[in-house]
Amino acid sequence: MALVKLQTQHFRNLLSAPVEFSPSFNLLYGANGSGKTSVLEAIGYLGLGRSFRVSRHQAVVAHGQSKLTVFGALDSGLLAQESSEKVEHRIGISRDVSLKETQLRVDGEAVRSLSFLAMHLPVSVIDPGVFDIVAGGPGKRRQFLDWLVFHVEPSFSSLWQQVQRVTSQRNQMLRNGRLDESLMRVWDSQYGALAESLSDIRETVFQRFKIAFESVLAELDAPWVEGLKMDFYPGWDRSTALTEVLVNHREQERRMGHTLYGPNRADIRLKFGGRPVAETFSRGQQKTLVILMKIAQGKVLSDLGKQVTFLLDDINAELDVRHRVMLARNLQELRCQVFITSIEHPEPDTLWHDGDTPEYRMFHVEHGQLTEE
């Protein structure tokens, strides 16, 4: 699905006029504070149900207001059966921060879960913070993998929620001064069964991702390609049943007061020469690696017939021309939708040297208003 129309109300400084976008590339430029990043943020809000910049919903509501609305029209690019009209969907989210109420709609019908919006509009953000996928802790890489797992395997979301609930119960018991071992084993059994199922799904999707990543990596002419190793760690050594691991480390978990083994400790381990790439790779190499990982994500979904909307915020500040060209070329090959922001007026010829410039729309953003050029 491509976002072909966006309309917001009381979202930061954006004006409420509807804007139509290209299903291919959209180039937005403007001075700092003009609202160009807010456009990406609104698109992300529509697909993620939250801001990718801040954690508080109040922060994105326009000054003096208590409620925001983001609406989008999506185009699959496909024709409906027995019709010459394209398949379109309309999705929207309204959030009243004073009443703490959220309304979600898909094609005019109320839905209860943000997952319905996310399934219609898979959004992948590439901004300065994304490079923490390599340099940051395991949680960043779990989040990266689980985004893909969610869009590949429909059962993942409910299974993950069950794991979270059981983990919370175990943690409460571990923090209890007097531990009931018989009851703890009951929770261990539930946790172990759910963890095995969840890890099976993660492992399957990871292997699909790894194949896509290696195909993208093979096109890169860099000396470190051969020595790079990527593996999935499920959160414990699966040669031993998780329930046994939990019993063997009961005192350790009790001292720490929370669950130390299982899917909440999963990681994508990236190593070069036997050491973590966060310790061995330069900042530039880490950026290249993250870009390739993001492209591989998009490739997995593209191979499944799903289109990702990529949001590239101020990449000129983080990526040199070579990296920008590599990213633009790969995204063009995926035939996905892309939004790119910059301070300077974009020059498409610098991204597509060979003259194979894709369809695009260009917008100047000033005081929250988008003007197409």
Curated annotation (Swiss-Prot):
One of its GO terms (cellular component) is cytoplasm. It is found in: Cytoplasm. PROSITE patterns: RECF_1. Keywords: ATP-binding, Cytoplasm, DNA damage, DNA repair, DNA replication, DNA-binding, Nucleotide-binding, SOS response. It comes from the Bacteria. Its main location: cytoplasm. GO terms for molecular function: ATP binding; single-stranded DNA binding. One of its GO terms (biological process) is double-strand break repair. The keyword tRNA processing does not apply. SUPFAM superfamilies: P-loop containing nucleoside triphosphate hydrolases. ATP binds at G30, A31, N32, G33, S34, G35, K36, T37. InterPro entries: DNA-binding_RecF (IPR001238), DNA-binding_RecF_CS (IPR018078), P-loop_NTPase (IPR027417), RecF/RecN/SMC_N (IPR003395), RecF_2 (IPR042174). The RecF protein is involved in DNA metabolism; it is required for DNA replication and normal SOS inducibility. RecF binds preferentially to single-stranded, linear DNA. It also seems to bind ATP. NCBIfam families: recf (TIGR00611). Belongs to the RecF family. HAMAP family: RecF. This is DNA replication and repair protein RecF. It comes from Marinobacter nauticus (strain ATCC 700491 / DSM 11845 / VT8). The lineage of its organism: Bacteria, Pseudomonadati, Pseudomonadota, Gammaproteobacteria, Pseudomonadales.
